[in-house]
């Protein structure tokens, strides 16, 4: 990630936010890869519109796509490096452009993940809740297993017997 961090604004911000909020960098990076990983790197202009990933070529295009989704009545739109959900978190940003700004997007995601960790006391539960609310156990389990797989694939962790059993592998 160090080499890629210099070229990818999301990855550089992940390193800064991990240090700022005392989050293991590998966990924050694996969450980002799970959210917007495309060809092995995080995407600052990524969106998820109604469950469909979209990789815009620019912030301007991403804004246009998000605005069109609003006009079309799409309720769930996730934006940026860490796929911040506009419906549930958009009021924490001054604009769509701010939500897509890698520094603001990653900082908010890291702060949110740290709050979840303080509430649930484990990184596994914090990661689970990052993706899905408390009443969606199947989605949480799938998500945590995808994050663990990315953590292992990037060299930040390894499969433990408990993780293998939990994820069914």
Per-segment meaning from a language model:
Residues 3-169:
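Catalytic glycan-binding domains that act on GlcNAc-containing polysaccharides
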């Amino acid at each position: 990630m160090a080499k890629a961090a210099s070229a990818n604004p999301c990855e550089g911000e992940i390193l800064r936010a991990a240090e700022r909020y005392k989050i293991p960098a590998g966990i924050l990076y694996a969450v980002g890869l799970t959210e917007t990983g495309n060809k092995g790197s995080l995407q600052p202009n990524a969106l998820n519109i109604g469950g469909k990933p979209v990789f815009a070529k620019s912030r301007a295009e991403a804004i246009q796509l998000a605005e069109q989704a609003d006009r079309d009545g799409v309720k769930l739109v996730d934006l940026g490096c860490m796929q911040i959900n506009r419906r549930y978190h958009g009021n924490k940003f001054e604009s769509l452009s701010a939500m897509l700004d890698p520094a603001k997007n990653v900082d908010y995601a890291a702060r949110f993940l740290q709050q979840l960790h303080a509430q649930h006391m484990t990184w596994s539960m914090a990661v689970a809740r990052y993706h899905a609310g408390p009443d969606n156990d199947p989605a949480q389990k799938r998500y945590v297993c995808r994050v663990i797989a990315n953590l292992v694939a990037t060299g930040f962790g390894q499969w433990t017997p408990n993780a293998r059993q939990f994820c069914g592998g």
